[in-house]
């Protein structure tokens, strides 16, 4: 028989930097999970990632206080900021441009994010990336 799921927990944790301090410790501790077990497992799985890359993780919590976790790809805004070489998006996205990304960069980001996006083709994934870029105040060139 399968374990009974009691809940899910969504966190965004820097790659290789999971530790028991807030926000991870309190979030897991409230649910009675072993904080260090999660931190060690997460850090082991994110060793290949660039340090401090934000990794969305969905933790499935079971009735016997065990857990499993699934890691997603980093947020689209993270990839867009890296591609445009900026620290943050525009404060007024419709008027001010914060930077520029090319179609080639958009395609590369779409290919990285494809497994997490709700689409079938690379073209539709590119449209999602372009929309995110525009909402951050980035200009899509070429």
Curated annotation (Swiss-Prot):
Tell me the Gene Ontology biological-process terms attached to this UniProt entry.
translation
The protein's PTM annotation reads: One or more lysine residues are methylated.
PROSITE patterns attached to this UniProt entry: RIBOSOMAL_L11 (PS00359)
Q: Which domain of life is it from?
A: Bacteria
Q: Where is the signal peptide?
A: none
Q: Which InterPro entries match?
A: Ribosomal_uL11, Ribosomal_uL11_bac-typ, Ribosomal_uL11_C, Ribosomal_uL11_C_sf, Ribosomal_uL11_CS, Ribosomal_uL11_N, Ribosomal_uL11_N_sf
Q: Which UniProt keywords apply?
A: Methylation, Ribonucleoprotein, Ribosomal protein, RNA-binding, rRNA-binding
What the entry lists under SMART domains is as follows:
RL11
GO cellular-component term (any): cytosolic large ribosomal subunit
GO MF annotations in UniProt: large ribosomal subunit rRNA binding; structural constituent of ribosome
Its assembly, as annotated, is: Part of the ribosomal stalk of the 50S ribosomal subunit. Interacts with L10 and the large rRNA to form the base of the stalk. L10 forms an elongated spine to which L12 dimers bind in a sequential fashion forming a multimeric L10(L12)X complex.
* Family recorded in the similarity comment: Belongs to the universal ribosomal protein uL11 family.
Q: Which PANTHER family match?
A: 60S RIBOSOMAL PROTEIN L12, LARGE RIBOSOMAL SUBUNIT PROTEIN UL11M
Task: State its role.
Answer: Forms part of the ribosomal stalk which helps the ribosome interact with GTP-bound translation factors.
What name appears for this protein in its UniProt entry?
Large ribosomal subunit protein uL11
Species, as recorded: Bradyrhizobium diazoefficiens (strain JCM 10833 / BCRC 13528 / IAM 13628 / NBRC 14792 / USDA 110)
